[in-house]
């Protein structure tokens, strides 16, 4: 398994997702650069200890070539390398590289990509690899990275990337072109909507996890949507641990997608057929498809409310009169 991740601005490169139960997301935390890679390595160590660590060839692969990471901040690269080494990855394969430029020639190379690219950024066309612009001519980094991930994956490779909500419903030609590319020419599997605040205090934007497999020949059928409300931490700047995390439920449901067809659109997760997504202009925002049940509120008759108000006025008047009498004594 090979995994690529790229840091962003310093304020965002401290955010990552942990691995759990063959699913890309366990919980949000702040771990420093290479957090994705470290979490993936820890997961493999827990689940495939004998297969990897008792096999010399596989252990060498684990230590040197299994994981790949790029960043444009040398300080973050040093911290990332140190993080990986302290977690048992002896020779971290991370490098100083501008992932979106012609400098990055990786194509059809990786089986897994986990990424938390910059939420907002704009580049000059001259600084972007020309093959990325062929899919969609855009300067927005959050869009360019999705195109890059498709290029870097092997056929059959899988990507889980955090994206700002705007990527899912943006109306520009570039937004639509990228969503169409993923839905029509590859296999879109899941959209996991996350609450605003999961990246505080670094960023307060609403985000989601998009999961897709590179096929080059379509394959999207039903897309799974999940509305995460609780990631196990408060949504303020302190991000303190709280009970009721949705993460275990996400993992369990994702592993049993066959059961999700029974769920209604009013529930926390549900499936949406490809045809409906196409009909909605490839809009991938969960609010486009989730149905909200409005409970009709019943209120007292206006005359009852007026009677109650008069009673309160009477009590207030009586109280004021009593207070005035006490003050006159």
Q: Which stretches of residues belong to each language-model region?
A:
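Conserved S-adenosyl-L-methionine
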Residues: 2-115, 120-122, 131, 139, ...
């Amino acid at each position: 398994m090979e995994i690529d991740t790229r840091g962003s601005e310093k304020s965002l490169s401290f955010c990552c997702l942990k691995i759990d139960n063959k699913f890309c997301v366990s919980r949000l935390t702040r771990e420093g650069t290479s957090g994705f890679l470290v979490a993936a390595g820890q997961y493999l160590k827990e689940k495939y200890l004998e297969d990897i660590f008792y096999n010399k060839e596989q252990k060498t692969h684990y230590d040197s070539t299994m994981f790949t990471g790029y960043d444009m901040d040398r300080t973050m690269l040093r911290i990332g390398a140190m993080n990986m080494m302290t977690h048992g990855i002896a020779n971290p394969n991370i490098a100083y590289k501008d992932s979106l430029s012609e400098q990055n020639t990786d194509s059809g190379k990786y089986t897994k990509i986990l990424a938390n690219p910059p939420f907002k950024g704009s580049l000059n066309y001259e600084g972007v690899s020309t093959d990325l612009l062929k899919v969609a001519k855009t300067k927005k980094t959050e869009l360019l990275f999705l195109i890059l991930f498709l290029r870097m994956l092997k056929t059959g490779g899988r990507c889980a990337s955090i994206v700002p909500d705007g990527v899912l419903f943006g109306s520009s030609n570039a937004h639509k072109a990228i969503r169409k590319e993923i839905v029509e020419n590859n296999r879109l599997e899941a959209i996991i909507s996350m609450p605003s605040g999961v990246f505080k205090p670094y960023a307060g934007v609403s985000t989601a996890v998009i999961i897709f497999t590179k096929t080059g020949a379509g394959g999207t059928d039903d897309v799974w949507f999940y509305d995460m409300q609780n990631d196990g931490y408060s949504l303020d700047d302190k991000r303190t641990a709280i009970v009721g995390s949705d993460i275990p439920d996400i993992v369990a449901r994702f592993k049993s997608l066959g059961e999700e067809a029974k769920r209604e659109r009013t529930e926390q997760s549900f499936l949406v057929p490809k045809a409906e997504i196409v009909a909605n202009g490839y809009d991938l925002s969960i609010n486009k498809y989730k149905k909200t049940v409005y409970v009709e509120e019943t209120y007292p008759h206006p005359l009852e409310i007026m009677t109650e108000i008069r009673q309160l006025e009477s009590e207030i008047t009586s109280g004021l009169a009593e207070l005035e009498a006490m003050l006159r004594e």
